From Swiss-Prot:
One of its GO terms (molecular function) is arachidonate 15-lipoxygenase activity. Binds 1 Fe cation per subunit. Pathway: Lipid metabolism; hydroperoxy eicosatetraenoic acid biosynthesis. The PLAT domain can bind calcium ions; this promotes association with membranes. Changing C533S: No specific effect on enzymatic activity and iron-binding. It comes from the Eukaryota. Non-heme iron-containing dioxygenase that catalyzes the stereo-specific peroxidation of free and esterified polyunsaturated fatty acids generating a spectrum of bioactive lipid mediators. It inserts peroxyl groups at C12 or C15 of arachidonate ((5Z,8Z,11Z,14Z)-eicosatetraenoate) producing both 12-hydroperoxyeicosatetraenoate/12-HPETE and 15-hydroperoxyeicosatetraenoate/15-HPETE. It may then act on 12-HPETE to produce hepoxilins, which may show pro-inflammatory properties. Can also peroxidize linoleate ((9Z,12Z)-octadecadienoate) to 13-hydroperoxyoctadecadienoate. The gene is ALOX15. Keywords: Calcium, Cell membrane, Cytoplasm, Dioxygenase, Fatty acid metabolism, Iron, Lipid droplet, Lipid metabolism, Lipid-binding, Membrane, Metal-binding, Oxidoreductase. It comes from Sus scrofa (Pig). This is Polyunsaturated fatty acid lipoxygenase ALOX15. Interacts with PEBP1; in response to IL13/interleukin-13, prevents the interaction of PEBP1 with RAF1 to activate the ERK signaling cascade.
Length: 663
């Protein structure tokens, strides 16, 4: 009984407000009060009013709301509702929403304090949890884009996605406008090319967008250098392939006359300075046919040596696997004629483009984040602490992935049009890679140890990934410790166990034999798993996404396709190189897509800087504040280090890491 002060916050994106009336109910532990039709929410505004309630409500548990429309359903994006009372000295309760309110159904918002099932011994929220999850399981259904791939949200297009997973209007307008600009520029360049020759490496300057990236200009000017070629395996846009060699690869067969090379490799191996990048995943992948023209793939192996100054230099390149009964494939060396060596490196860079975009970026970044998101939406209610912890890291992931499946890797999509693995090879490559995913490879401390990169001082990716993982891990531990006091409390959380099982057994098609857990038996195991989820959706994706504009704008450094077969002799000329690299249209389309996906996103939210407040109470806020302080300190450390580097490494700098897979 008494006076309650109610505040209602509406989102600031276009069309977030509504002309429809909204009715509220306050639901307490001892009673319920209808407040009537009390507001028409305005975009970007907080609406405040007071209401006298005659019933005794007790501690507030829910706010219920319903929108009424006469002629047109005008959706409303509600941020949160705050209720303070009874009286001026009454407690304040916060009810997070952060979703669209549509139609005229009643929506129940639980008070923002996170609760596991164990935290609700009276069962005050039991019915709500069950009903919410039942509804979500109907809304968030598993789909299977291609047989043999990890699962995705069941959606044929953006319009049948759950409404809360779609781009807000400002994001949609920016994304579609940038796409239109890129395609318009492509059309202009294509029309101009009719009158111009395409016969030298300088011709690629005609489609290079100056002023977009200083590093891209540096790549254009220095891409032929062996040091820059090797640097990309350490700190480029795909740092996931390089391994420290523990023996010479079995596939590395030495033709007669190569004894000196073998001795040099053995010497580097014994000294612990030999590294390798093996592209065997491409073996047997069918190459694309574009406009009746056959494209080609290689299966390179690169052996590199780490110098005392930290430079990683290539020693030998093998472009094909040896096959019994066939001549040994040639080994290309830095001492070969310049065009021969350059063409071999171009083949490696094109192969890296394929594995990066499909394996490291799409599969390990986008699709893995989607599995985490769908499993979470199906298994954890909005009141659960792990749901509240993870939900900011799913923003826009499902829509950007649907757009990728319908535009980039779809039939007649970008890959089919200009990429050598298109036309079906890209799907087979994804299947192969998905079957090899391991839990440890998503956890930098384990992955970097396995690949032997922990002690490589010039691997800034390794250094920054470890530090960012540790910061995220402490953040997760802070939240988990507020809600799980013992290992037993983790085991007893049936929602948590169902979530873990759904992720591994269903979303990943039964990946427990590759280390992914099907249950969580301790606080430590829970923290490690949740840290993996957040790092995958943030740092890991950013490390494979942010470098695209820098390293792929100069097309010869990362050719999307190759138009002649890999060389079997050492007689390449400039004409051979130009006939092998992408033609004008292919290069222009690569540049346009690279710009659209790699440009600075105006709606970008940096790691940990989300405005949504899903938790209530001082404990979680203190943990988030400490997380932000640690991110800022790491950001500053990286800034100071980068000031001393000829090539600054920015891709895991917290201020540049996006809070979710949103592009």
């Amino acid at each position: 009984m008494g006076l309650y002060r109610v505040r209602v916050s509406t989102g600031s994106s276009f069309y977030a407000g509504s002309q429809n009336q909204v009715q509220l109910w306050l639901v307490g532990q001892h009673g319920e009060a209808a407040l009537g039709w009390c507001l028409r929410p305005a975009r970007g505004k907080e609406t405040e009013f007071s209401v006298d309630v005659s019933e005794y409500l007790g501690p507030l548990l829910f706010v219920k709301l319903r929108k009424r429309h006469l002629l047109q359903d005008d959706a409303w994006f509600c941020n949160w509702i705050s209720v303070q009372g009874p009286g001026a000295n009454g407690d304040e309760f916060r009810f997070p929403c952060y979703r669209w309110v549509e139609g005229d159904r009643i929506l129940s918002l639980p008070e923002g304090t996170a609760r596991t099932v164990v935290d609700d011994p009276q069962g005050l929220f039991k019915k709500h949890r069950e009903e919410e999850l039942a509804e979500r399981r109907k809304l968030y259904r598993w789909g299977n884009w291609k047989d043999g791939l990890i699962l995705n949200i069941a959606s044929t297009g953006i319009h049948d996605l759950p409404v809360d997973e779609r781009f807000l209007e400002d994001k949609r307008i920016d994304f579609e406008a940038s796409l239109a600009k890129g395609l318009a520029d492509l059309a202009v360049k294509d029309s101009l090319n009719v009158l111009m020759s395409w016969n030298s490496l300088d011709s690629f300057n005609r489609i290079f967008w100056c002023g977009q990236s200083k590093l891209a200009e540096r790549v254009r000017d220095s891409w032929k250098e062996d040091a820059l070629f090797g640097y990309q395996f350490l700190n480029g846009t795909n740092p996931m392939l390089l391994r420290h060699s523990v023996e010479l690869p079995a596939r590395l067969k030495f033709p007669p006359g190569m004894e000196e090379l073998q001795a040099q490799l053995e010497k580097e191996l014994q000294g612990g300075t030999l590294f390798e990048a093996d592209f065997s995943l491409l073996d047997g992948i069918k190459a694309n046919v574009i406009l009746c023209s056959q494209q080609y793939l290689a299966v390179p192996l690169v052996m590199l040596k780490l110098q005392p100054d930290g430079k990683l230099l290539p020693m030998v390149i093998q472009l094909q696997l040896p096959h019994e009964g066939s001549p040994l494939p040639p080994l290309f060396l830095p001492t070969d004629p310049p065009m021969v060596w350059l063409l071999a490196k171009c083949w490696v860079r094109s192969s890296d483009f394929q594995l990066h975009e499909l394996h490291s970026h799409l599969l390990r970044g986008h699709l893995m984040a989607e599995v985490i998101a769908v499993a979470t939406m199906r298994c954890l209610p909005s009141i659960h602490p792990i749901f509240k912890l993870l939900i900011p890291h799913f923003r826009y992931t499902m829509e950007i992935n649907v757009r990728a499946r319908n535009g980039l890797v779809s039939d007649l999509g970008i890959f089919d049009q200009v990429v050598s693995t298109g036309g079906g090879g890209h799907v087979e490559l994804l299947r192969r890679a998905a079957a090899l995913l391991t839990y440890s490879s998503f956890c930098p401390p384990d992955d970097l140890a396995d690949r032997g990169l922990l002690g490589v001082e010039s691997s800034f990716y390794a250094q920054d990934a470890l530090r960012l993982w540790e910061v995220i891990s402490r953040y997760v531990e802070g939240i988990v410790s507020l809600h799980y006091k013992t290992d037993e409390s983790v085991k007893e959380d049936l929602e948590l166990q169902a979530w873990c099982r759904e992720f591994t057994e269903i979303g990943l098609l039964g990946a427990q034999d590759r280390g992914f857990p099907v249950s969580l038996q301790s606080k430590e195991q829970l923290c490690h798993f949740v840290t993996m989820c957040i790092f995958t959706c943030t740092g890991q994706h950013s490390s494979n996404h942010l470098g695209q504009l820098d390293w792929y704008s100069w097309v010869p450094n990362a050719p999307c396709t190759m138009r002649l077969p890999p060389p079997t002799t050492k007689d390449a000329t400039l004409e051979t190189v130009m006939a092998t690299l992408p033609n004008f249209h292919q290069a222009s389309l690569q540049m346009s897509i690279t710009w659209q996906l790699g440009r600075c996103q105006p709606t970008m939210v940096a790691l940990g800087q989300h405005e949504e407040e899903y938790f209530s109470g001082p404990g979680p806020k203190a943990v988030l504040t400490k997380f932000r302080e640690e991110l800022a300190a790491l950001d500053k450390d990286i800034e100071v280090r980068n000031a001393k580097l000829a090539l600054p490494y920015e891709y895991l700098r917290p201020s540049r890491v996006e809070n979710s897979v949103a592009i």
